[in-house]
A protein has these predicted regions:
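N-terminal amphipathic/basic-hydrophobic helices that include classical n-h-c signal peptides
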Residues: 1-15
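N-terminal intrinsically disordered, cationic/polar leader segments
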Residues: 12, 16-157
Length: 157
């Protein structure tokens, strides 16, 4: 008899053949995409966040790398905290990102319900809007959850 209560309930008893038990158990425990709503998918994408300020760039043809090891947000599905490191690389054109405002911007994610993928893409979108770089790349390396380690990367252009 399976140990998981949903599997036992779905089988309706112990008289089911072993081959059928496996199939019913898989179906009983299957996570469907119906459990993730459009609201989950869009969570945090249009949230009001602090403005990222800039200052006038004086040089051309160099790269800036900023590593932010204290990224936190909330998973919109589970409500559990997510942790990670955000790495921003860009080549400035006419403006550079002001670091204090960038720090305040990233810390605003702390209580925001947003998926990893949306966070990385939103950060890139806001960085590009703020400083109009020649190119930019945002990489999010997130702490393992359930044995899975996720790295998300978004690029401009």
């Amino acid at each position: 008899m399976p140990r998981h209560p949903l599997a036992r309930e779905a089988m309706g008893g112990a008289s089911v053949k072993r081959k059928e038990k496996r199939a019913v158990t898989r179906d009983a425990l299957r996570v469907t995409s119906d459990e993730y709503t459009e609201a989950h998918a869009k969570s945090g994408v249009t949230a009001d966040l602090p403005e990222i300020e800039t200052w006038p760039n004086q040089y051309k043809g160099y790269e800036i790398t900023i590593e932010i090891p204290e990224y936190t947000a909330i998973c919109p599905k589970t409500g559990l905290p997510d942790f990670g490191t955000i790495r921003l690389r860009y080549m400035p054109d006419k403006a550079c990102l002001e670091l204090k405002s960038l720090k305040l911007y990233i810390h605003a994610y702390r209580n925001l319900g947003i998926f990893y993928e949306n966070a990385v893409n939103r950060i890139l979108q806001d960085v590009v809007a703020a400083c109009r770089p020649v190119w930019a790349r945002v990489t999010g390396e997130f702490t393992a959850r359930g044995g899975l380690h996720s790295t998300i990367e978004a690029k401009y252009p």
